[in-house]
């Protein structure tokens, strides 16, 4: 009980500090926010040896816990990935500042001039699992949008997140911004998550970033509004009019480039007319690359294909595994996606413009692609600098959540002694 009380008191203090920081951060100048992000990027690069040392502790911890290869890949930092984090941070710094942007403006016959302008959300709570880079992405995007943020990373990335967070705080300090603008929960105790979900007085929105278990827990127990980032059950439909060269290139990239990210392809749907030719070539190429293919009855006749079970449809592997089945036509493909998908990202490979238009119009996923790798389902690749997650719900934000999506708006109404009749 005493431990629970101490966690509750700690989270209450963190929440109060965040609320106070948010009050001043909402009016912080563009120049100060830019300076804080650029400075943080410089500190990360300067302190990369210490950050990699901290990450080595997390890797050892993850190995002892028996984490899967996919989870270990998400956890791993090296110099190249740190360079990517620094580049992303600088990119966010250079983005247009969304705060104060006039979204719409109009005049009423009554003489009123009305503007709808972007405003910060306030305090954002981000709960995530093993990826240490989320510490930087979430901190940077929230700061850019004038929000304070409370970060609760996974126990596996505890040391890495701490080291990266210290660089973000140094950036805030250098720019004379409140250090409480970006806070990291300093404990692995899971009670901190439960506390965050009920902090309605200090947290304005919660963003869960992780697997089905984490997101489900947050959606069930949160009393604070939630931006849901569901698992990426990503489908690629190979149409009868697909180009062979493009298809092979896109499928291989979508599945094998990085299997542990939410935009990795998890299920292939192959039109029956191209199954004996292009479909078979794709399956064999995947297996040659070391991918385990779990196929339906038709595909399991190909040597090396494992027969799929009911559990393989609608599953996020995050590994060198893909489910695959033959479909009768585009309607059959879309029906499968509606049944087993997660409204994250889905793709059609075709040269038939009409089929592409139907697929992109009729499917209701947050991101729908045509002839492009699903690994592009990423805020950085969308020109947002970074993302805090891919929102799969329909309220407020959808798709990659960048700085602009971390704002609300208010109406500024001006008159000249104007009264209502």
Curated annotation (Swiss-Prot):
EC numbers for this chain: 1.2.1.41
Reactions catalysed according to its record: L-glutamate 5-semialdehyde + phosphate + NADP(+) = L-glutamyl 5-phosphate + NADPH + H(+)
GO molecular-function terms, A-Z: glutamate-5-semialdehyde dehydrogenase activity; NADP binding
Annotated coiled-coil segments of the chain: none
Pfam families: Aldedh
Pathway(s) it belongs to: Amino-acid biosynthesis; L-proline biosynthesis; L-glutamate 5-semialdehyde from L-glutamate: step 2/2
Function: Catalyzes the NADPH-dependent reduction of L-glutamate 5-phosphate into L-glutamate 5-semialdehyde and phosphate. The product spontaneously undergoes cyclization to form 1-pyrroline-5-carboxylate.
UniProt similarity note: Belongs to the gamma-glutamyl phosphate reductase family.
Identification of the protein by name: Gamma-glutamyl phosphate reductase
């Amino acid at each position: 009980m005493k431990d629970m009380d101490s966690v509750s008191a700690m989270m209450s203090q963190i929440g109060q500090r965040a609320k106070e920081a948010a009050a001043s951060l909402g009016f912080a100048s563009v120049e100060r926010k830019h300076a804080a992000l650029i400075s943080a990027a410089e500190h990360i690069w300067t302190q990369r040896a210490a950050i990699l040392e901290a990450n080595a502790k997390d890797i050892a911890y993850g190995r002892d816990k028996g984490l899967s290869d996919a989870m270990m890949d998400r956890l791993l930092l090296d110099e190249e990935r740190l360079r990517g984090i620094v580049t992303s941070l600088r990119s966010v710094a250079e983005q247009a500042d969304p705060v104060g942007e006039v979204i719409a403006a109009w005049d009423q016959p009554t003489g009123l001039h009305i503007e709808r302008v972007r405003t910060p959300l306030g305090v954002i709570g981000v709960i995530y699992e093993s990826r240490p880079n989320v510490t930087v992405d979430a901190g940077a995007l929230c700061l850019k949008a004038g929000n304070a943020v409370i970060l609760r990373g996974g126990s596996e990335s505890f040391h890495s997140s701490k080291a990266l967070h210290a660089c973000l705080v140094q950036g805030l300090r250098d720019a004379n911004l409140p250090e409480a603008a970006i806070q990291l929960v300093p404990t692995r105790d899971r009670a901190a998550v439960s506390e965050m979900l009920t902090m309605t007085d200090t947290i304005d929105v919660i963003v869960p970033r992780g697997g089905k278990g984490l997101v489900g827990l947050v959606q069930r127990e949160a009393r604070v509004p939630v931006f849901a980032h569901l698992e990426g059950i990503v489908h690629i439909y190979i149409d009868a009019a697909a180009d062979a060269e493009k298809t092979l290139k896109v499928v291989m990239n979508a599945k094998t480039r990085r299997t542990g990210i939410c935009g990795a392809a998890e299920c292939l749907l192959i039109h029956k007319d191209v199954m004996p030719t292009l479909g078979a070539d794709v399956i064999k190429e995947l297996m040659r690359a070391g991918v385990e293919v779990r196929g339906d009855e038709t595909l399991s006749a190909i040597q090396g294909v494992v027969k799929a079970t009911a559990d393989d449809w609608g599953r996020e592997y995050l590994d060198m595994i893909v489910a695959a089945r033959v479909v009768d036509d585009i309607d059959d493909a879309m029906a499968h996606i509606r049944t087993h998908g997660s409204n994250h990202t889905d793709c059609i490979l075709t040269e038939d413009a009409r089929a592409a238009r139907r697929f992109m119009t009729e499917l209701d996923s947050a991101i729908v692609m045509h002839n492009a790798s699903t690994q592009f389902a990423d805020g950085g690749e969308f020109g947002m600098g970074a993302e805090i997650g891919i929102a799969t719900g329909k309220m407020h934000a959808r798709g990659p959540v960048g700085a602009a999506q971390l704002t609300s708006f208010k109406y500024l109404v001006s008159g000249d002694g104007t009264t209502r009749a």
